[in-house]
Amino acid sequence: MPSLFRASLLFSLGILLSRIFGYVRDATVAYYFGASAVSDAFFIAFRIPNAFRRIFGEGGFNAVFIPFYGEAVKQNREEEFLRKTFGLLITFSLSVVIIGLLFPEEIISVISPGIKEKETFSYAVEFLKFTILYLPLVSFYAYSMAILLVQGKFFVPSVSQTLFNLGFILSLVILFHTLGHYSLALAVLIGGLFQIIPNTFLLFKEKLLKIPKFSLDREIKTFLKKFLFTLGGFSANQLSLFVDTFLASFLKVGSISYVYYAARIYLLPISLFSISLSNTLLALVSTKKDKEKDTDTALKLTLMLSIPSSFGLFFLSREIVSVLYKRGNFSEEDLFYTSGLLSLYAFSVPFYSLQHILKTVYYSKKNVEIPTKSAFLSVFLEALFGSVFIFLLNFGVYSFPLAALISSSSVLVYLYQKLPQKVSIPFGNLIKYLIASSFMGGLVYLTESLTQNPFILVSFIPIYALFYYVFLIILREELAILISYGIFRRGKILQRESN
């Protein structure tokens, strides 16, 4: 257990560093390009290689590769398997690169048909010719990360993504004044090279860097089939991003950037709280008999964290966007639309967070069918309602958070209804979380009437969180009391040990 905890801690630390530098990367793009035709074009062109990066990073490749690799190690076929899978990845990535280089205009037209008559289209076509070259780099990153994880190397693979962001930021800052918008495309490639350097060094050091072998024998065919099947579930979330890009291309210039900037912020509490909770829950319910108790606790804890996060994003949307992005070429109009989107996206945070917990219940029972169906249902609903809101009701860019709210709540109901054993809904706790969050929102509103400085208001977030937590204790909410008891008890123990 200590080794598991240490490995999880190291991996989480690497991911946290990557998140921090990821936001610095976005802020740098916003500084130089704001929400413009150039930024829209870049986010469109980077969508394809970035989708593969996220699929690989979220475990789509690891989920298949690691069991096969582990079996090959046991049978002393490690080198042969590594050579064949390396060859497969090279073939796959280079095939996609060739298609991207031969048909860039057609690909951009399919992804974002609404920009064909706009200046954005020519920029996107130019960018794609560069960004598609990132795919072999990210494929090698996924391959090397999977090998190193099996070898017990956790921190370096997780921190490699940070090096991508760091390389991207430095390249953009250094090259912008010389190359202009082309600095964005080159920053992706330089960041990709930064990303694979530490993994390559470790593979070479451990003598695990093999010469690729191009083979399509029975083992590789089985591996490929399982990978493509697994890819379906992991790619559904990325398909949702393509749907958003497709629909946003029909709106005013800058809309794709508005959606991107806002989504990056509202997804943060979901990834920090619910994903980490769901991973922990999966480990617990897979080994313990008292699964219902752990699931109930996870649901309460998810609500306890996601509801105030939702309130905070709603009340502080303008201030948060201002602190993160409002500088350089990020205009007042960009701030208006991005913060407006964020305030609406905030309502979806609890629904998406709870989805992760319920999906974990299915995974613990080895049921991948329902979570996969729910992911594609989510894409369908977002596409349906997004189209209705944009083309029939003319809601413009605000169509996306409204469609996300309907989709996320509907999918949550679907996941709950399909549970073989219903988990109890903690209505009593829910009411307390809503009351405490409302009073926290009142405190935010009060401080906003005293100062309009966004940096001061955002710096008060820990105070708002503490106020919410204390209010829960006043309401006698059991989880808050247990947490406070644990903190107080640990403090007493440490005090006795120091004496």
Swiss-Prot record:
<comment type="similarity">
    <text>Belongs to the MurJ/MviN family.</text>
</comment>
<keyword id="KW-1003">Cell membrane</keyword>
<feature type="transmembrane region" description="Helical">
    <location>
        <begin position="130"/>
        <end position="150"/>
    </location>
</feature>
<feature type="transmembrane region" description="Helical">
    <location>
        <begin position="265"/>
        <end position="285"/>
    </location>
</feature>
<feature type="transmembrane region" description="Helical">
    <location>
        <begin position="4"/>
        <end position="24"/>
    </location>
</feature>
<comment type="function">
    <text>Involved in peptidoglycan biosynthesis. Transports lipid-linked peptidoglycan precursors from the inner to the outer leaflet of the cytoplasmic membrane.</text>
</comment>
<feature type="transmembrane region" description="Helical">
    <location>
        <begin position="375"/>
        <end position="395"/>
    </location>
</feature>
<dbReference type="Pfam" id="PF03023">
    <property type="entry name" value="MurJ"/>
</dbReference>
<feature type="transmembrane region" description="Helical">
    <location>
        <begin position="335"/>
        <end position="355"/>
    </location>
</feature>
<keyword id="KW-1133">Transmembrane helix</keyword>
<feature type="transmembrane region" description="Helical">
    <location>
        <begin position="154"/>
        <end position="174"/>
    </location>
</feature>
<feature type="transmembrane region" description="Helical">
    <location>
        <begin position="425"/>
        <end position="445"/>
    </location>
</feature>
<dbReference type="GO" id="GO:0015648">
    <property type="term" value="F:lipid-linked peptidoglycan transporter activity"/>
</dbReference>
<feature type="transmembrane region" description="Helical">
    <location>
        <begin position="297"/>
        <end position="317"/>
    </location>
</feature>
<feature type="transmembrane region" description="Helical">
    <location>
        <begin position="455"/>
        <end position="475"/>
    </location>
</feature>
<feature type="transmembrane region" description="Helical">
    <location>
        <begin position="227"/>
        <end position="247"/>
    </location>
</feature>
<keyword id="KW-0133">Cell shape</keyword>
<comment type="pathway">
    <text>Cell wall biogenesis; peptidoglycan biosynthesis.</text>
</comment>
<feature type="transmembrane region" description="Helical">
    <location>
        <begin position="26"/>
        <end position="46"/>
    </location>
</feature>
<feature type="transmembrane region" description="Helical">
    <location>
        <begin position="88"/>
        <end position="108"/>
    </location>
</feature>
<dbReference type="InterPro" id="IPR004268">
    <property type="entry name" value="MurJ"/>
</dbReference>
<keyword id="KW-0813">Transport</keyword>
<protein>
    <recommendedName>
        <fullName>Probable lipid II flippase MurJ</fullName>
    </recommendedName>
</protein>
<dbReference type="GO" id="GO:0005886">
    <property type="term" value="C:plasma membrane"/>
</dbReference>
<feature type="transmembrane region" description="Helical">
    <location>
        <begin position="184"/>
        <end position="204"/>
    </location>
</feature>
<keyword id="KW-0812">Transmembrane</keyword>
<dbReference type="GO" id="GO:0015836">
    <property type="term" value="P:lipid-linked peptidoglycan transport"/>
</dbReference>
<dbReference type="GO" id="GO:0034204">
    <property type="term" value="P:lipid translocation"/>
</dbReference>
<dbReference type="GO" id="GO:0071555">
    <property type="term" value="P:cell wall organization"/>
</dbReference>
<keyword id="KW-0573">Peptidoglycan synthesis</keyword>
<dbReference type="InterPro" id="IPR051050">
    <property type="entry name" value="Lipid_II_flippase_MurJ/MviN"/>
</dbReference>
<keyword id="KW-0472">Membrane</keyword>
<dbReference type="GO" id="GO:0009252">
    <property type="term" value="P:peptidoglycan biosynthetic process"/>
</dbReference>
<dbReference type="GO" id="GO:0008360">
    <property type="term" value="P:regulation of cell shape"/>
</dbReference>
<keyword id="KW-0997">Cell inner membrane</keyword>
<feature type="transmembrane region" description="Helical">
    <location>
        <begin position="396"/>
        <end position="416"/>
    </location>
</feature>
<keyword id="KW-0961">Cell wall biogenesis/degradation</keyword>
